Every structure is written in C-alpha cells, then in structure tokens.
Curated annotation (Swiss-Prot):
InterPro entries: Ribosomal_bL28/bL31-like_sf, Ribosomal_bL31, Ribosomal_bL31_B, Ribosomal_bL31_sf. It comes from Paraburkholderia phymatum (strain DSM 17167 / CIP 108236 / LMG 21445 / STM815). The keyword Ribosomal protein applies. The lineage of its organism: Bacteria, Pseudomonadati, Pseudomonadota, Betaproteobacteria, Burkholderiales. Keywords: Ribonucleoprotein, Ribosomal protein. This is Large ribosomal subunit protein bL31B.
C-alpha cells in the first residue's frame, strides 16, 4: 500500500452524551480530545445517540431534541401555529 494516503485507523472512545454510555471501537474519525477508559488513553468522540439511547433499540418512546429544534420552531412559528396570526 502507498504510504501517507490512508487515514489513521485506530481505537477511539465514543461517549453517548445523553446517558454517558462509553464504548471503544476502531475508527478513522479525527479528534482533538482524549479521555481515559479502562486505564488506557483514547481519542474521544462525543455522540448524541447510540444503540444504548436510540428509541428503536431501547423500546422507549422519547423526543430526541438535543439541538433545541422544537424550541427554535416554536419561537419562530409559535404564534402562527397556535392560531394567532401575526400581521
């Protein structure tokens, strides 16, 4: 294989920010942060949803609004959606 053209494939620590679930897998993701897990330091990737928190895998229904999309929509269109037409 040619040198210098392939991404760095290494073990990376992923943390599910919704429930602090941690797992290590191999990935080419580029990160600046590191964290210690089971006595070893890994590059750190923070994720919003994993199999431990996704409703499909957990069987629980919940609204996943980590970016505040619902509040942003209600702020922008709330008056129109509730029947109060702003003119």
């Amino acid at each position: 294989m040619k040198e210098g053209i392939h991404p760095d494939y290494r073990e990376v620590l992923f943390i599910d920010m919704s429930n602090d679930f941690k797992f290590v897998t191999r990935s080419t993701i580029q990160t600046r942060e590191t964290a210690e897990f089971n006595g070893k330091t890994y590059p750190l990737a923070k994720i919003e949803v994993s199999s431990e928190s996704h409703p499909f895998y957990t069987g629980q229904q919940k609204i996943m609004d980590t970016a505040g999309r619902v509040e942003k929509f209600n702020k922008k269109f709330g008056a129109r959606a509730s029947g109060k037409a702003a003119k």
